[in-house]
Amino acid sequence: KNFTMFTEKEQSGYHNLCRITHLEIINFAIKNPDKKVIIKPKWGGKWIDYIYNLAHKENIDLESIKNLVINEKLNSFDLIENSSVVIAFNSTTILEAAIKNKVVIIPNFAEAEEKSLKGFVMLRKFFNLFEIAESSKDLYEKINLGCKNPGKHKKFLQKRISVYERYISPIKGNQIEKCIGILKKQIQYNTFK
């Protein structure tokens, strides 16, 4: 199984958290050549450039790390399905991976613990359902442990599903059909002139 890092929103105030998290994941890939490590930014372009520039500043040649993939075009749902560990911050990916019973690591250090930004960290009241990395060292250790014990959160699955349903959508039933039905009803009441 893989482990995947989803780089979600470009957080204006979480620069050190972002930098440290990416470097620690790259470091994990370097030290664990037998593990496939995937970083999936939400967007390409400057987001990919950011990761390459970050590595370059640390004298790391990303192209030489054969087990590391950085690609924004990969299918998120396939990545979650095929990963044992998922790292995300302020993203629905946290809950999407949680209901698949994955080890979900939320980096929660640097600016995420500063008084001015602490209140903007999503799902904080549900942190007990996830692995919370409180430092770069803790992040590395949690990735390592997650790869060794990918099913450790089974006891939280029902609670994770409840949180998913609260913030995303009910799991039961065909959500696509429900959305189409809602849109059809809405369309009949709206006219374009």
What kind of feature is each model-predicted range?
Residues 52-72:
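Nucleotide-activated donor-binding/catalytic signature segment of Leloir-type glycosyltransferases, i.e.
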Residues 3-9, 35, 43, 131, ...:
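C-terminal amphipathic helix plus adjacent low-complexity
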Residues 73-83:
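Short acidic alpha-helix that forms the nucleotide-activated donor recognition element
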Residues 55-60, 92-168:
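Catalytic binding pocket for nucleotide-activated donors in carbohydrate/polymer assembly enzymes
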Residues 1-57:
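Conserved catalytic-core segment of nucleotide-activated headgroup transferases in glycan assembly
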Residues 39-41, 88, 106-108:
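Short beta-strand/turn micro-motifs composed of small residues
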